[in-house]
């Protein structure tokens, strides 16, 4: 799907250089179809980098996707220019009366922070409750998975003693599930988290269906049977260099991090890493857009299927 964004968004030129199909709002009206409306709640500090990563994955199908970027943290950003936020992001009050086909909630570097200590925790709760009645399908990524499990299912925060960082092998549990359609039996995906997602915990305390696990038995991909919510505990959107950037940042901060697993060639941080998960990430987001959003969303968004309760 060509993603539809404002002409001036920096991602337009960045992604076009990669031959990603981006349609600006000035061109889009020439196609007489209703674009899918997808809201991205971007919780990552480096918002422009994160925009590029997610927009790349949303761009590779035949329908238009109308992207709206959302922020809920009113504090001044140290990593993203205020002008960018003011020009390209909306506040929740701007869209709370609208309906959307899809919502993506990104990760956030909050793995060691208690939920109630997160500055925008009340706003997270507000958005997730709102989404029940205003969004066809929501996709949670990494830390957002942990937050959603707490808000929607009452599951306490589960934290690892050491950070999981690297590129790990996974296997699918339901090869005929729509969200894993076309996946290889085993596939690679990056992780960068303190959050812990034991598969047994998901099975015991939710009615969610686990679709893929790590080799160590952690849940990687799971979803509700009605397709209204889906969860991915890793970072399939990451660029080839993202884990390297996090590793060297932590080295400079004196945190003595472990070298990300199965990432640098020959396990040597001086070697340039390669993305071995790109096809998986593209297929995951294409499947979500097609089977969890496009196939079940109403043509007229004024007539939503209400509530997950």
From Swiss-Prot:
Q: Where is this site: Important for acyl-CoA specificity?
A: 111
Query: What cellular component GO annotations does this protein have?
Result: cytoplasm
Q: Where is the active site?
A: 142, 235, 237
Query: Some GO term, biological process aspect, for this entry: which one?
Result: L-methionine biosynthetic process from homoserine via O-succinyl-L-homoserine and cystathionine
- The site (Important for substrate specificity) lies at 192
- What UniProt keywords are attached to this protein's entry? Acyltransferase, Amino-acid biosynthesis, Cytoplasm, Methionine biosynthesis, Transferase
Q: Which residues bind substrate?
A: 163, 192, 249
Q: Which positions, given as ranges, span the membrane?
A: none
- Enzyme Commission number: 2.3.1.46
Q: Name one GO molecular function term.
A: homoserine O-succinyltransferase activity
- Give the UniProt subcellular location, in the record's own words: Cytoplasm
Question: Is Transmembrane helix there in the keyword field?
Answer: no
Q: Which reaction does it catalyse?
A: L-homoserine + succinyl-CoA = O-succinyl-L-homoserine + CoA
Protein's pathway? Amino-acid biosynthesis; L-methionine biosynthesis via de novo pathway; O-succinyl-L-homoserine from L-homoserine: step 1/1
InterPro entries given for it?
Class_I_gatase-like, HST_MetA, MetA_family
Q: Report the superkingdom from the record.
A: Bacteria
Its job: Transfers a succinyl group from succinyl-CoA to L-homoserine, forming succinyl-L-homoserine.
| Oligomeric form and interacting partners | Homodimer.
**Stated family:** Belongs to the MetA family.
Q: What is this protein called?
A: Homoserine O-succinyltransferase
Q: Which organism is it from?
A: Salmonella gallinarum (strain 287/91 / NCTC 13346)
């Amino acid at each position: 799907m060509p993603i539809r964004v404002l002409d001036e968004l920096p991602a337009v030129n960045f992604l076009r250089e990669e031959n990603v199909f981006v349609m600006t709002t000035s061109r889009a009206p020439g196609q007489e179809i209703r674009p899918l409306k997808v809201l991205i709640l971007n919780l990552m500090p480096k918002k422009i980098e994160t925009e590029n990563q997610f927009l790349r994955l949303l761009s590779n199908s035949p329908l238009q996707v109308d992207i709206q970027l959302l922020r809920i943290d009113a504090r001044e950003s140290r990593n993203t220019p205020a002008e960018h936020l003011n020009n390209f992001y909306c506040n929740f009050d701007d869209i709370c009366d609208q309906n959307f086909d899809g919502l993506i909630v990104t990760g956030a570097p909050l793995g060691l922070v208690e939920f109630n200590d997160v500055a925008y925790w009340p706003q997270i709760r507000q958005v997730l409750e709102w989404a029940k009645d205003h969004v066809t399908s929501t996709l949670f990524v990494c830390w957002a998975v942990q937050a959603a499990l707490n808000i929607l299912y009452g599951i306490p925060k589960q934290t690892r003693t050491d950070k999981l960082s690297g590129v790990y092998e996974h296997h699918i549990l339901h090869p005929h599930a729509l969200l894993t359609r076309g996946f290889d039996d085993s596939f690679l995906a990056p992780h960068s988290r303190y959050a812990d997602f034991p598969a047994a915990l998901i099975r015991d305390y939710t009615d969610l269906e686990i679709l893929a696990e790590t080799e160590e038995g952690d849940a990687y991909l799971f979803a509700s049977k009605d397709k209204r919510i889906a969860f991915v505990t890793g970072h399939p959107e990451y660029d080839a260099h993202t884990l390297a950037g996090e590793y060297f940042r932590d080295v400079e901060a004196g945190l003595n991090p472990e070298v990300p697993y199965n990432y640098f060639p020959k396990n040597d941080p001086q070697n340039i890493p390669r993305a071995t998960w790109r096809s998986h990430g593209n297929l995951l987001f294409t499947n979500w857009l097609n089977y969890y959003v496009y196939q079940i969303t109403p043509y007229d968004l004024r007539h939503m299927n209400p509530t997950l309760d």
